[in-house]
Amino acid sequence: MSYPGYPPPAGGYPPGAPGGGAWGGAGYPPPTMPPIGLDNVANYAGQFNQDYLSGVAANMSGTFGGANVPNLYPGAPGGGYPPVPPGGFGQPPPAQQPVPSYGMYPPPGGNPTSGMPSYPPYPGAPVPGQPMLPPGQQPPGVYPGQPPMTYPGQSPVPPPGQQPVPSYPGYSGSGTVTPAVSPAQFGNRGTITDASGFDPLRDAEVLRKAMKGFGTDEQAIIDCLGSRSNKQRQQILLSFKTAYGKDLIKDLKSELSGNFEKTILALMKTPVLFDAYEIKEAIKGAGTDEACLIEILASRSNEHIRELNRVYKTEFKKTLEEAIRSDTSGHFQRLLISLSQGNRDESTNVDMTLVQRDVQELYAAGENRLGTDESKFNAILCSRSRAHLVAVFNEYQRMTGRDIEKSICREMSGDLEQGMLAVVKCLKNTPAFFAERLNKAMRGAGTKDRTLIRIMVSRSEIDLLDIRAEYKRLYGKSLYHDITGDTSGDYRKILLKICGGND
């Protein structure tokens, strides 16, 4: 069967890789990592083991982009928004910026339930099936201070305070549609940001005093490390060794214990290194934590996953793909290997001809046949861009009358079903996906502490504010409330510090 307008002419879908340069494409990784920018300890650098310094510098540069960051907001043609700046925790640089990744909400009206928690639309979104009100009659935006957003051919929007929440335009007919950008991408939506007036040497002294002598001042450690960004914590590590000739990590291990120790040590690793150790732990010994593997690989950006491959090989002397192959099998293994390539299309345009073709192929591979062609689901869900797949999910619902999640539940089972569902949920609404994971970690008898720690730490500088909002919306209680009731002692205190407040 053929479809009008497909395949697209040369230069169409998929888009070409971004050009080379210091921030992506053929030029990535750069021949030399940019400097870390630790000016305040530069005079002491000669005292360190140079292999140790270069390793830390490489990790930090890969994660945070180094100090020589180019202008983040160049002029955009046509008066549109400039590219979204890097957001930390492996977010891609401007030249490789994907479609809304963290903090992404689904199109207005969400999707029908499929036996799983329903992910609601953004506050202020129109009633499903109803057209958007014209500018000037829109409900107030939920992000005060956000600059007005305009698109080619659109009438001027109201000033801040009277501005609508951006929404996806209707997908009808063929052609190319550029989706709106999620408000959560404009600014940091994490609970932890760079501390103002930061002095790593002073913080090193505070930590030294907290662990010196008889007993440990756990509250001082919580107040210090729980309110510094990951980049700042890496500087504290260097300053501590400079000032005292001791390894801060070893001192923390000797003074702390239990889940409190695990949380503090998680905060001290760079985001990519933390993920590498979480994956290593997930496949170690008897049994595999499949949910951990799919959570990490389904939710991280392309650049973060590429850096994760490099760090994993350096730390454990085997590739990430080799580790996955050694501990998984079948279609679930293929799904993980596909995601571990960090090669998802990052285009922001949507070709509706290709969308309709993918919908037809997904339907033919599942609901419209005896048995399931899992490889077709894998190929489409792991390679297409986020914007394209959101359009596919909407069109699938329109054309088949069934939500894509419900079809996956009907056609698959076991780890593959859970893996495919995780990919779809991350694409639709990343904060809601993590809210559901947190709720499951604390629900019922016992707490899945590793999951709780991993999500709280890894999302603390990205979208934990959005996760908190989704948690309250889905479960009627605040995340802060449930953490308080499910944990205790210093472990509870550090998690609540990361949580950042009650809703």
Curated annotation (Swiss-Prot):
Does the record bear ATP-binding in its keywords?
no
* One of the GO BP terms on file: cytokinetic process
The keyword Repeat appears for this protein: yes
Q: Which UniProt keywords apply?
A: Acetylation, Annexin, Calcium, Calcium/phospholipid-binding, Cell cycle, Cell division, Cytoplasm, Cytoskeleton, Nucleus, Repeat
> Where is it localised?
Cytoplasm; Melanosome; Nucleus envelope; Nucleus, Nucleoplasm
Name the segments for region: Disordered.
Answer: 80-197
SUPFAM superfamilies xref list: Annexin
InterPro entries, alphabetized: Annexin, Annexin_repeat, Annexin_repeat_CS, Annexin_sf, ANX11
Task: Show the PROSITE patterns listed in the entry.
Answer: ANNEXIN_1 (PS00223), ANNEXIN_2 (PS51897)
Q: What is its main location?
A: cytoplasm
- Top-rank taxon, per record: Eukaryota
Coiled coil (UniProt feature): none
Tissue specificity annotation: Expressed in a wide variety of tissues.
Molecular function per GO: calcium ion binding; calcium-dependent phospholipid binding; phosphatidylserine binding; S100 protein binding
The UniProt entry's GO CC annotations, sorted and at most eight, read: cytoplasm; melanosome; midbody; nuclear envelope; nucleoplasm; nucleus; plasma membrane; spindle
> Which Pfam families is this protein grouped with?
Annexin
Q: Where is the composition biased (Pro residues)?
A: 80-97, 118-167
Please give the residue positions where the record annotates the modification N6-acetyllysine.
Answer: 246, 253, 477
Sequence ranges of the Annexin repeats: 198-269, 270-341, 353-425, 429-500
The annotated subunit structure for this chain is: Interacts with PDCD6 in a calcium-dependent manner. Interacts with KIF23 during cytokinesis. Isoform 1 but not isoform 2 interacts with S100A6.
Q: Which family does it belong to?
A: Belongs to the annexin family.
What the entry says about domains is: A pair of annexin repeats may form one binding site for calcium and phospholipid.
Q: What does this protein do?
A: Binds specifically to calcyclin in a calcium-dependent manner. Required for midbody formation and completion of the terminal phase of cytokinesis.
- State the protein's name: Annexin A11
Q: Which organism is it from?
A: Bos taurus (Bovine)
